[in-house]
Amino acid sequence: AIDDNRFDQMFKLAEMWQAEEVKLNISNAEMRPRILPNQDIKVMVKWPTDATRMIESFMVATNACVGNMLGKAGAPLPWRCHAPPDTAEVLELNAKLAALGVDIELPMPSFKTHGQSDSDELSDLLGAWANTTIAPIPTVKPPINEANDVAPYLANVLDPKARQDILDSLMDAQSKASSLANKTRRVVDQGLFHLMQRANYSHKNLGHFGLNLDAYAHFTSPIRRYPDLMAHRQLKSMIRGEDWVYDEAETADIAEHCSNQSVIAKYIEWELVANAYHIHLLRGGEVDSTSQNTYPPIMEKSWPARIVSLRTPWVYLDLNDDGAIQGRMHLRQMDSKQRLNIDENGLEVTSAEPGRDGEHRVVARLGEKYPCRLRGIDIWGGSLDLAPR
């Protein structure tokens, strides 16, 4: 399609939309193992291309357009919702960055909704903290008129300005991280990635933080996702002036069911992809290559890995330091003779007992290179089992 001039206008329009977008730039490689008929395994790593970005732009625009159209009409929908970062996780990342001496501090997320005053937001927060309902703080409010009304389907959506402020702060952190040394930059990138919540379906529209949209409903894939089929049926009802096919109660039940099933399906996909790739590695295969259906002894091989996360009792490593392949190493693999600890900020692996000098020996630090080798695969966890080189 890139070389076909029939698509020139579509590419230009998509590029214009992309230039105007205000959203996080988080692109991860997609691992694509293929099990061939003779049981050989072919593995490729796919990154976004101009063509896939163009298609994604049109799909997102279509989903948002249909969501707003049906939302204004009052149609019950299984909205695709994505929440902003969790306050506790922002605090944890800030503490980690401060301990690393990185001059990046993320502000606490705001949870102000469309049309909500600052005092009402404060009341909601205080009520949530106290696990009770607190009467709104009295304020002088302007008279409500048609211009100030908030459409019912947007009542629970994060205020666009509040959402914009959070996104701006995260993008600013990304920009600052790009000028840091590799060791620190990867830590910041990984931390920002893990701030992102998992999207889900809900009968209440909560907006889509990652896409920076007030309303988002899956519509473009009715042959493989039931929520898309629901949106198609509701749209037909609107066009024909008929009653909604799905009412609010049924939509709520289906949205919850689809969310649960999508999580299960995603975990199964991750495990299958991971295990196929790990078997490929055990056969001595590489990325963008085919491994034979034989099992010769693995030759001693190591990767120039980088430590990207420390969470007791695991050390997570990026094998090629490019974000494509990750595995994990148990603390016991780093030193079988003594017990090791990870500090509260997830910055260092140290000896649990002090040495003769009274100091705790530092075994490894977050962001450091740590060459490793493959021990095997954790079939149930779907992860590479690593050991020091």
Q: What are the language-model segments listed below?
A:
Residues V349, E353-K369:
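C-terminal structured domains
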